[in-house]
């Protein structure tokens, strides 16, 4: 599913985006963000992050640098040093 969604975004980048010009208010562009989010987080969460980003891409938002959040580790340490020992 992730690959299909990435191919759809890539088709947009190659087939539609060149006719619209570079109007994205963010870096990376929304379509690049979508591909990276899908790769990093999978189809479900990646789609959610991409949709959330698209909702921010409008003239009343300042834009700027907005990287894809890194996947958090499932092992969270509760020790002060962060080593994970008990």
Curated annotation (Swiss-Prot):
Keywords: Cell inner membrane, Cell membrane, Membrane. It is found in: Cell inner membrane. Coiled coil: none annotated. Residues 64-86 are annotated as: Disordered. Residues 70-79 have a biased composition (Low complexity). It is a peripheral membrane protein. InterPro entries: Membr_insert_effic_factor_YidD (IPR002696). The keyword Hydrolase does not apply. One of its GO terms (cellular component) is plasma membrane. Could be involved in insertion of integral membrane proteins into the membrane. Belongs to the UPF0161 family. This is Putative membrane protein insertion efficiency factor.
């Amino acid at each position: 599913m992730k690959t299909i969604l990435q191919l759809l975004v890539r088709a947009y980048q190659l087939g539609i985006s060149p006719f619209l010009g570079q109007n994205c208010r963010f870096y990376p562009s929304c379509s690049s963000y979508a591909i990276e989010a899908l790769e990093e987080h999978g189809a479900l969460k990646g789609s959610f992050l991409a949709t959330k980003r698209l909702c921010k891409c409008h003239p009343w938002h300042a834009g700027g640098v907005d990287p894809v959040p890194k996947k958090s580790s499932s092992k969270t340490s509760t020790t002060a040093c962060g080593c994970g020992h008990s």
